[in-house]
């Protein structure tokens, strides 16, 4: 509202529930003329943390009763009360009780004088996190004075200081004087002095954050620069001068050496100069070698990309035959280790070269670096933060190599199986014709790569996973000695997996021993993890053989073929028997006697019982 001109103006505030004045009471206000102040609107989002009682409590100690002309009024009503409907709901606004009842709001187009209080401006720091983007200014907090709150929010003020509108915290620093009174100007000046000092502190703190550059520590292995010819002469003569004059200072010794150098003949000087030149040449050579060594060390520290392939044993190209009852071979993906495992991009060029060479040829070994955080907690290694996976040109049923798809993200949703170091012996043509065969390119896994082990024993690890095989850490079952000179009759191995999914890293593998002449075994093997050294890198060397994903079980039929005998002379199939087999149609020319047939069958049965005890059911036909 506008007040008419005059020196004595009275503002009557009416309202049945006003906490300060009744309708008959008035208070005196000085005239400010007809000046009008434009108060800019302020848009605030709803903030449930701003309650009316909190804001009122903030101003409990801000009233100055001593500066008021009406002592009784200031003593009784000195507390500034603020109604803050900052976009709040009606229910929250009613928490203020009588402060909001009766429609008691002021439209303050004129500033009420500072006769009742000489306090500096009251500021409210509003966090900018929930504000609209329009209020995001130069600083994290916005300062709002009472006049803005009173005009925008309809505040009831009990004699508090009213300031001219402030558009921003920076505008408050301008030199324009306030039109109210000298007391008000003093308060604003004090407020002005405080703000630049605060800004200066912030700037100084920002400058102090810059850490001084640290000097590089000199490498003790770095070759030292050669000294000059004069320095060589100084070294030679200093000891002699010190011996003659023990009390001579360094400056005196230097003067004596300088005079001796000047009086030295040119030929003697050339001797020292030649020594210096030779030392420079040696220094340059040593420096070049030192730099090369530093670069090599930096390359080794990042990733060692030169794998050491284990010893390889030649084996015939195996052929896996799938039982017709099982579904068609599905795509086989690496095991789901994490929601997304992206292989290091440094292998992309290497992958491109492998893709051009195709599936044929000698497979190369690729290292895939997978961080420890990407692996589930059940298979994290206790020795380090990195797990190095070395698949040897993995061939899946899609006909793709894992090395070629290493730049793609491994999908975690599909459960898949990696069978490592499993060599399925060649199947006979007659038996293979009755079963569904996989295409030849997908049936060529790399040659058997064996771990460095005694030739008489091969470790087999079987992991249990819902659809396929997976490693379970069970106590090793009874050792079964099988001496295969030729392949036994076809075995059908049916794996009935457990309902629970477990992957463990400390492997206690069941052991199947074969004869020294036949170190190869025909049992599928999974996830052989080796820890060659106590370093922080573990290596998993995996050879993936295509397999069939079946909802309940997986049938792998091993059909006897024509294996490559490692010994020049065929021997009996039974483990431990060194006799040559006799010709017999019933035994397929594999046994030397009926006793060996019975013992071999007993060993196979015991192996089946042991595997059943370790939660792997193997049916032997």
Curated annotation (Swiss-Prot):
A motif (Nuclear localization signal) lies at residues 213-218. In liver, recruited to target gene promoters following treatment with dexamethasone and cAMP. Binding is decreased in presence of insulin. Residues 307-319 have a biased composition (Pro residues). It is found in: Nucleus; Chromosome. Keywords: Chromosome, DNA-binding, Methylation, Nucleus, Phosphoprotein, Transcription, Transcription regulation. It comes from the Eukaryota. SMART domains: HMG (SM00398). Expressed in liver (at protein level). Residues 223-291 bind DNA. The modification Asymmetric dimethylarginine is found at residue 481. The keyword Transcription applies. This is TOX high mobility group box family member 4. It comes from Homo sapiens.
């Amino acid at each position: 509202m506008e007040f008419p001109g005059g020196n004595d103006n009275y503002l009557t505030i009416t309202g049945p529930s006003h906490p300060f004045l009744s309708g008959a009471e008035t208070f005196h206000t000085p005239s400010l003329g007809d000046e009008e102040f434009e108060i800019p609107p302020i848009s605030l989002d709803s903030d449930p943390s701003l309650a009316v009682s909190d804001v009122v409590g903030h101003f409990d100690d801000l009233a100055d009763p001593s500066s008021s002309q009406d002592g009784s009024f200031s003593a009784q009503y000195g507390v500034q009360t603020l109604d803050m409907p900052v976009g709040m709901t009606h229910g929250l606004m009613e928490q203020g009780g009588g402060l909001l009842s009766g429609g008691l709001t002021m439209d303050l187009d004129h500033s009420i004088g500072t006769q009742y209080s000489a306090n500096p401006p009251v500021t409210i720091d509003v966090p900018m996190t929930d504000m609209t983007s329009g209020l995001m200014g130069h600083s994290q907090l916005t300062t709002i004075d009472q006049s803005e709150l009173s005009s925008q929010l309809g505040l009831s003020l009990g004699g508090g200081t009213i300031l001219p509108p402030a558009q921003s915290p920076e505008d408050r620093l301008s030199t324009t004087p306030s039109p109210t009174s000298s007391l008000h100007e003093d308060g604003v000046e004090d407020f002005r002095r405080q703000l630049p000092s605060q800004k200066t502190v912030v700037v100084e703190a920002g400058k102090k954050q810059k850490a001084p550059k640290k000097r590089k520590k000199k490498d003790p292995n770095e070759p030292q620069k050669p000294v000059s010819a004069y320095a060589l002469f100084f070294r030679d003569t200093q000891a002699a001068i010190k011996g003659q004059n023990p009390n001579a200072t360094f400056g005196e010794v230097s003067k004596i050496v300088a005079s001796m150098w000047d009086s030295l003949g040119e030929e003697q000087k050339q001797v020292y100069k030649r020594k210096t030149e030779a030392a420079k040449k040696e220094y340059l050579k040593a420096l070049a070698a030192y730099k090369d060594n530093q670069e090599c060390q930096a390359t080794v520290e990042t990733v060692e990309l030169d794998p050491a392939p284990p010893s390889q044993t030649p084996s015939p190209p195996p052929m896996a035959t799938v039982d017709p009852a099982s579904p068609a071979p599905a795509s086989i993906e690496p095991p789901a280790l994490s929601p997304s495992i992206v292989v290091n991009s440094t292998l992309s060029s290497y992958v491109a070269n492998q893709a051009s060479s195709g599936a044929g040829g000698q497979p190369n070994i690729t290292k895939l670096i997978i961080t420890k955080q990407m692996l589930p907690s059940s298979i994290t290694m206790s020795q380090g933060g990195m797990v190095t996976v070395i698949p040897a040109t993995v061939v899946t049923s899609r006909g793709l190599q894992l090395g070629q798809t290493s730049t793609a993200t491994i999908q975690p949703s599909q459960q898949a199986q990696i069978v490592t170091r499993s060599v399925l012996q060649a199947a006979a043509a007659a038996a293979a014709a009755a079963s569904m065969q996989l295409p030849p390119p997908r049936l060529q896994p790399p040659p058997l790569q064996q771990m460095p082990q005694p030739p008489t024993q091969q470790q087999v690890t079987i992991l249990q996973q819902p659809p396929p095989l997976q490693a379970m850490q069970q106590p090793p079952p009874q050792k079964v000695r099988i001496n295969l000179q030729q392949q036994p009759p076809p075995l059908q191995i049916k794996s009935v997996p457990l309902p629970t999914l477990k992957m463990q890293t400390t492997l206690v593998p069941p052991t199947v021993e074969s004869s020294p002449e036949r170190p190869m075994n025909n049992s599928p093997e999974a996830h052989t993890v080796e820890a060659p050294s106590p370093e922080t890198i573990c290596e998993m060397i995996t050879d993936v053989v295509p397999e069939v994903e079946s909802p309940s079980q997986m049938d792998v039929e091993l059909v006897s073929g024509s294996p490559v005998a490692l010994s020049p002379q065929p021997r009996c199939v039974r483990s431990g028997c060194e006799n040559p087999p006799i010709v017999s149609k019933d035994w397929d020319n594999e046994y030397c006697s009926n006793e060996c047939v019975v013992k071999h069958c007993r060993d196979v049965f015991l192996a089946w019982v042991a595997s059943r005890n370790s939660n792997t059911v193997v049916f032997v036909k």
